[in-house]
A protein has these predicted regions:
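Rossmann-like AdoMet
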Residues: 1-7
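S-adenosylmethionine/decaboxylated-SAM
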Residues: 10-186
């Protein structure tokens, strides 16, 4: 955590890197920019002409991300869109991206998925971060603190869809706080 802003854990970062190197995408979608750390990190494993579109709800974090991206000379490679991802995703064109990194509001992953699938090309990869919720997602609904039950239930639903939707092949990995790697079937 950097100044109270969550960033990707080192072991999760390594898995993300290997997926980028394997896929070699030209168009990447990130949901959950925060201060731009992951977007900037991903550019190190993409070709010079690859583009990242990253979505962030917070105006404050969007401004900080844009500053960080500009300071590192990545503004031509990374586009930051400020707004609710559930809405901004709807504005993105179909079959545009080869890779999606989902690392935003955990209770919203299930709501992002239909549009993520729509904007990804066949053969596209979805990497979902923080899916195990410190192990809570494996617990019974009733053992989870009341304030965390909505996140718990929605994350379980998300994982169920990832592993049961015929359009996807998914692996759930205990890396960092849990990652799912899903491939959109062609």
């Amino acid at each position: 955590v950097k100044r109270g802003v969550p960033v990707i854990r080192p072991e999760a970062r390594e898995l993300l890197k290997t997926q980028l190197l394997l896929k070699k995408p030209k168009r990447v979608l990130e949901i959950g920019t925060a201060v731009g750390y992951s977007s900037i990190y991903m550019t190190g494993f993409l070709s010079e002409d690859a583009q990242i579109t990253t979505l962030e709800l917070s105006e404050e974090r969007t401004a900080e991300a844009r500053t960080n991206i500009k300071q590192l000379g990545k503004e031509t490679q990374i586009q930051v869109i400020c707004g609710d991802a559930a809405e901004t995703l709807k504005e993105l064109p179909d079959d545009t991206y080869e890779f999606a990194f989902v690392d935003a509001a955990k209770a919203q992953y299930i709501y992002y998925l239909p549009d993520v699938l729509r904007v990804l090309k066949p053969g596209g990869v979805i990497v979902s971060d923080n899916i195990l919720q410190e192990g809570e997602v494996l617990e019974s609904h009733f053992l989870v603190e009341k304030r965390n039950r909505t996140i718990h239930d929605r994350m379980r639903e998300y994982l169920y869809v990832l592993t049961h939707d015929d359009r996807l092949e998914t692996a759930i990995l205990p890396v960092g706080d849990g990652m799912a790697i899903s491939i959109v079937q062609e």
